[in-house]
Amino acid sequence: MRHAAVAAALSALALVSPAAGQDAKPAPPPPPLQVREIGSLHVGGRVATVEGLPAREITFSPGAPPTRIDPNGQFPVEQMYAQYVKLQEPRARYPLLLWHGGGLTGVTWETTPDGRPGWQMFFLRAGHDVYVGDAMERGRSGWARFPEILPGEPVFRTMGEGWGLFRIGEQSGWNPDPARRVAFPEARFPVAHWDQFMKQGVPRWTTTDRQIQAAYDALVQTVCPCVVVVHSQGGNFGFTAALNAPDKIRALVAIEPSGAPPQAAEAARVKGIPHLVVWGDRIASDPFWTRVRQNIERWQDQIRAAGGGAETLDLPAEGIRGNSHMLMMDANSDEVASRVQRWMESKGLMRD
């Protein structure tokens, strides 16, 4: 009965075509989740020492006396944060870890810009315990002084940069005035809520991959065995985490990953870990994304040559058009998640 209820909930989450749903009554809301525990943790990191900086006085609150601040001393740095939700009766054999992309945080997985439940809720309803992480330097993980501790300086994404990069529309279709923006005609991203999406953006560094990887590896050692779902910049961190701990990761799902391990990486180490890579629309017509995909396919070929399994879910090849780089936020996000869920079921990752 419990399995039937889960199947019914997943069916309710799947999108129907507008034509099919015009005269249909709204689906009843799914039953409440039976949650055992909600919590969080920080993992990884080190203690850094800052020396030689001048002290100064700062007033922290209006009307309060100034406080003398000495910026020299020891600081915890390079840690990462993760929040978890554990179910009363999970169907999945292992917890599911959701890792975000560049310039973003775990908010990616929580709620879509137009207010729909995100993949965190989808996979909870599918029966997974879910961990949502903020990479080192992002969100609730925090960042450190720069350049004294973090090398380089942060990069900030403008509101318009992602319009073309994330394949919402041509870059020339971006305009600060929402009424003048032009998206692709088949776009599934909720374009009317682009400004809401951009509020998720946070500073990022291009010089901290080693530290980010170390924190993700610490998370894997703390909470796994597990299944990892990664997006964009998170792709290479997930691939590398599997290389670093092949005994801990049971499967890896990469949603439009933007990077992969180098040619010299030992793909045989992950031959026992099933891999799935998911691609949205308009990859072939975009030179940047064409090169990205070629690099990922090179890594998939290496895994297969080593005797492992590396599959691809090409949504346009399946007749699903219009998906952007932000698949988990597109109008058919539940449909895509359902396909990922079925793949995990086919790999024996759910209890019978």
Please provide the spans of the model-predicted regions:
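Conserved acidic catalytic loop of the alpha/beta-hydrolase fold
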Residues: 206-227
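N-terminal cap/lid segment of alpha/beta-hydrolase-fold proteins
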Residues: 24-91
